[in-house]
Amino acid sequence: MYIELSNMTCSVRPVQDHYSKTIDNVLTTLQLVDAPTEEAFDKFTRLVAQFIKVPVALVSFVEEEKDRQFFKSQIGLTGKWAKSRQTPLSHSLCQFVKRDNRPLIIEDAPQDVRVCTNLAITDLGVRAYLGVPVHDPDGNALGALCAIDTQARTWEKSDVDGMVDLAACVSDQISLRAALHRQLVSHRPPSQYAP
């Protein structure tokens, strides 16, 4: 799909991830999706909102197989997005962070050819976006820690550096959860494995 925007061509590329099923399994097994919010993740979104001074901060896990992103933690969303704690990928910039496994820096989303047709702009009010990947213990990107502003803005180097550090802490939290899960599974009696 192509859209003309201020003498620029805006195209949308589909997200494709060869590890989608494996990652979806990790997300479910570690209770990172379809599970209640947790202070272990909420503290990171609070830090992002306070120190980067944005109205919206998310820990978002992307599930291509289910065509959605799930918000393990969020600050600042309202309405149906806050209640459901998820959006379809048509409303996700975090999917690109996961796909490319690197930070995504958007200063003015409606004018950025990489994302200008994404429905997060019109339906969620996203204008500026800074997302950094979060990873499982094997280094696979699972989603993003992101800062969202409803106004165009120039992200400072300190914003990006801080987000990279905080995303690493989110990844550490996921690794701790995975280690605990492995420990619990290894100590289960054999009878608990039977259907």
Positions of predicted regions on the chain:
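Regulatory sensory and allosteric helical modules in signal-transduction proteins
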Residues: 56, 62-70, 79-127
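Amphipathic alpha-helical "output/dimerization" segments
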Residues: 155-172
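A short, aliphatic-rich beta-strand micro-motif
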Residues: 127-136
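Localized chelating/binding microdomains
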Residues: 97, 111-112, 159, 168, ...
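Short beta-strand-to-loop transition segments that serve as allosteric relay/switch motifs
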Residues: 144-153
